[in-house]
Amino acid sequence: MMEPLERASTLPCWSTTVTPVPLSGGLSNHNFVVEDNGQKYVCRVGADQPIHNVLRFNEQSVGRAAEAVGVTPRQIYTEPDVLVIEFIDGKTLGPKDVSIELDRILPRIKHFHEAGMRALRGPILGFSVFHIHRHYAKLLHDANSRMRPELERLIEISEELETAVGPVKV
């Protein structure tokens, strides 16, 4: 099995010899900035992580829908464990940035959840951040995590947020 850097550098989508540069971020994948023929791309290499509810085919399907409604950059190339998208020069928003930009961010999220859902094609899995919270809480509980005493309180907060969000149209 190839290492992620080697995998990223030998993809058939490149028209020239490329030298991927590691990009920080990605909890379950390796990210690289790749320049090919004067264009920059982001290459993500990572296998499915079922324990974290990360299934790459689902990410790619949802990504294509997001691309179709103008929310994300264009997907250039995919394989089961690889995603190459156009690079957007910018910065990752931190909590303070999100707070400041919330009035601009929320309409984009709403747009994707309305128009993006109609753009989905093929099989997809549902995603609920609240389900993820419950899943992780059970994993931490079963592992006798140091966070175990906090889990009930955290799940109560998550349930309050889920109630505030209300039913999600799919």
Residue ranges and their predicted role:
Residues M1-E3, P149-E156:
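A generic alpha-helix signature
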Residues M1-T19:
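Juxta-kinase regulatory segment immediately upstream of eukaryotic protein kinase catalytic domains
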Residues M2-P4, I76, L140-H141, P167-V170:
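Short intrinsically disordered, low-complexity coil segments enriched in acidic
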Residues R7, R108, H135-L139, L154-A164:
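Residues that form generic nucleotide/phosphate-binding pockets
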Residues P12-V18, N58, L154-A164:
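Short Pro/Gly-enriched beta-strand edge/turn motifs at strand-loop
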Residues V21-D142, R146-E150:
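ATP-binding pocket architecture of kinase catalytic cores
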Residues A115, T163-K169:
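Protein kinase catalytic-loop region centered on the HRD/HxD motif
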